[in-house]
């Protein structure tokens, strides 16, 4: 299904994307545009393909040889699905934060510095500045500035997830992918992450997968509803939640199934 938006404002353009887990056809003819410096949410019931779609944007599936994508995904006009794509550089441009907080088994400081060192050779002073910048962007600096050399595991769950966001933006990507980033967090921590998502779009293109429709409504500018591997509806968030065009969308957001 084709649901393109304004191409001139697109960071990612998906065209006729099909995805397979072995012989299982998980994504079916997906076409949509992800707008620059906006938050796009993917919603739908479990197994609908929303996380699969998200993970095609940085080719996470390449870790598993039985998985494959067909079609086109253009990032700034370049098709990332070609074999010529440098995976390391792609994942530097397209950062990802997972469902459960995944701090590295190292200090808070080194959690941030680790990825930066893979792509840049910074002086200690410049690295200190980058670490502070990333933690500040992730609304974590004031809580960690006096314990940067303590383990990342010493932080609370909500703090660990913000640490993962700081780690993701420290390498200065263009796009930030968030796969159910609040599902393991308490309501207060969730609120802080949602505030952070709204702030991050001034610098990044953000794509979030969420089971929480209220979260999608609060955080996103555009929302895609998926069902059984198909893109059912894609529009600006207010329109999708107030005047959905497809009965399947209306049934889902009103709780008739899901």
Curated annotation (Swiss-Prot):
GO BP term (any one): phosphate ion transmembrane transport
InterPro entries linked to this entry: AAA+_ATPase, ABC_transporter-like_ATP-bd, ABC_transporter-like_CS, P-loop_NTPase, PstB-like
Known function: Part of the ABC transporter complex PstSACB involved in phosphate import. Responsible for energy coupling to the transport system.
EC top class named in words: translocase
A Gene Ontology cellular-component term: plasma membrane
Subunit structure: The complex is composed of two ATP-binding proteins (PstB), two transmembrane proteins (PstC and PstA) and a solute-binding protein (PstS).
Keyword Cell membrane on entry: yes
Topology in membrane: Peripheral membrane protein
MF terms (GO), sorted A to Z: ATP binding; ATP hydrolysis activity; ATPase-coupled phosphate ion transmembrane transporter activity
UniProt main location, coarse: membrane
Residues engaged in binding ATP: 44-51
Family designation: Belongs to the ABC transporter superfamily. Phosphate importer (TC 3.A.1.7) family.
Organism annotation: Yersinia pestis
Protein name: Phosphate import ATP-binding protein PstB 2
PROSITE patterns: ABC_TRANSPORTER_1, ABC_TRANSPORTER_2, PSTB
Ranges for domain ABC transporter: 12-253
Keywords: ATP-binding, Cell inner membrane, Cell membrane, Membrane, Nucleotide-binding, Phosphate transport, Translocase, Transport
Enzyme Commission number(s) of this protein: 7.3.2.1
Residues that span the membrane, as ranges: none
